[in-house]
Regions:
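N-terminal alpha/beta PP-like core and its mobile active-site loop of ThDP/TPP-dependent enzymes
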Residues: 2-340
Length: 340
């Protein structure tokens, strides 16, 4: 996943930027975000207003439930190869969305989740409703299954926070990020002398790459294999990966078993292992390309020992996603070598 478009350079805020929410929407536009899905809520009415009144702002997709909004963002990212945004109303909207956010986390999908909260100033709260809808740390609801979260408390902090969220969600392995903005921050006028920062100064980190020694070792093992099989997982995330896998399979003459978490290999290709029985059972070497769950396809073969044991070459980003809260990391698989 890479950023789309070239954000503008640093500039003083033009007259069109009057409110905090205007600056937030400007960042969405600079990031190349084309669509925003949400179930309307009062805690982000400022952002909603700026989306409606800013020419060229991301298109709005109205939803009846927050889980639908986040699920739309998940599907969009998988189809378009870039994130979209979903707006979530306060504590209750975030709670509604939590299951869909966990789905996106498990699916390694990039998305910008933007929530409203407060007012944090108790003097500005309406009786009852604003109190039960405000949390001390709202992100704690989903902190265990997002890559990063933040709640900037002034406009001087919003730009860097947004840039960090964008680079974090787009870096591999991908995942959702959550930003939370106080109602007052959105609806207050921009401070005098406000300079709108360029998020283009903060590029997405390059994806991890294996060491040359690991590549040479993998090549030696694959060339020596009698019945190599490629097991494909998240390697199909980008078009260039799709084409590279076809070239690798053809160079090795190795069938490819696509696990289906992404469309990694053309099912009509002669080396497609779709529906072909016995491939993994008879393989002497399996090259697993970013497969998180190996126990299902390989089963008891993971426990083989001796000269005829399966040689598993595990190339994966999964360890970089590891968190302590859920066991979505799957069983630890023994391998000849694990390469990131």
């Amino acid at each position: 996943m890479t950023a789309t478009g070239a954000p503008p350079a640093d500039r003083a805020a033009p007259p069109a930027l009057r409110w905090g929410s205007d600056a937030i929407v400007a960042h969405l536009m600079e990031a190349g975000i084309e669509h925003v899905a949400f179930n309307p809520g009062a805690s982000f009415r400022g952002i909603h207003d700026s989306l409606v009144h800013t020419p060229g702002a991301p298109a709005i997709t109205l939803c009846m439930h927050e889980m639908v909004a986040v699920s739309i963002a998940q599907g969009y990212a998988k189809a378009a190869g870039r994130p979209m945004a979903a707006l979530l109303h306060n504590v209750v909207g975030l709670q509604n969305a939590s299951m869909a956010i966990y789905n996106a986390w498990c699916d390694r999908v990039p998305m910008l989740l933007i929530g409203g909260t407060g007012p944090k100033s108790k003097a500005n709260r309406r009786p009852w409703i604003d109190w039960i809808h405000t949390a001390s740390v709202q992100a704690s609801i989903v902190r265990d299954f997002v890559k990063w979260d933040d709640e900037p408390h002034d406009m001087a902090s919003v730009g860097e926070s947004f840039a960090r969220a964008l680079t974090t969600t787009r870096s591999l392995p991908s995942g959702p990020v959550y930003l939370c903005y106080d109602v007052d921050l959105q609806e207050d006028a921009l401070p005098a002398g406000y300079v709108h920062p360029s998020i283009g100064r903060y590029p997405v980190p390059s994806p991890p790459a294996p060491a040359p020694a690991d590549v040479a070792w993998l090549e030696q093992r694959l060339r020596a294999a009698r019945r190599p099989v490629i097991l494909a997982g998240y390697v199909g995330e980008a078009p260039e990966q799709f084409a590279a896998l076809v070239a690798l399979a053809e160079a090795l003459g190795a069938p490819v078993v696509d696990t289906g978490v992404r469309h990694a290999f053309p099912s009509g290709h002669p080396l497609s292992g779709a529906g072909v029985p016995g491939l993994l059972e008879e393989a002497d070497v399996v090259l697993a390309l970013d497969v998180e769950e190996l126990q299902g396809p390989l089963g008891a073969r993971l426990e083989e020992t001796g000269e005829d044991a399966l040689q598993l070459l595990n190339v994966t980003l999964a360890p970089l996603k590891l968190r302590a809260w859920a066991h979505d990391y799957q069983p630890l698989a023994p391998a000849e070598r694990q390469v990131t």
